[in-house]
């Protein structure tokens, strides 16, 4: 898996204390992106699932894992495997994506389907600078949605 960075004690990337992984590579290139250094798929560094799980295990207080970016769905198979391993440790998984839920759901891409199945909360949609709102929880712009497990399992978006 190619990543830009990790944060082992985030409180801004989902509920509770989180281990956040910033994946490397993003096709969206949203103007005003908070993480433009994650766009280049050749940037960052290569890490194994075992390395990430070991790093995650160093903080016994974390409640969940957040997959951010970059675009996690650009490395969906690796992210799904990591999410499954996190669930095995009793951690919840939040995934941020510049894609809309409907696009991910309808894509027919089995790796995307696998990552959706391992995601407890999906924050979807591209960052839109004109819709930036600092008052929003866990989102940068008002077009983005926070979709919970029920919405994902029902295959229809419901604001969480």
What is each PLM-predicted segment?
Residues 2-4, 17-18, 35-114:
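Conserved Radical SAM active-site core
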Residues 113-117, 140:
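Short, conserved loop/helix-junction motifs that constitute active-site signature segments
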Residues 2-29:
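N-terminal pre-triad scaffold of radical SAM enzymes
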Residues 119-121:
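Well-ordered beta-strand positions
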Residues 75-89, 94, 132-160:
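P-loop/Walker A phosphate-binding loop and immediately adjacent motor/lid segment at beta-alpha junctions
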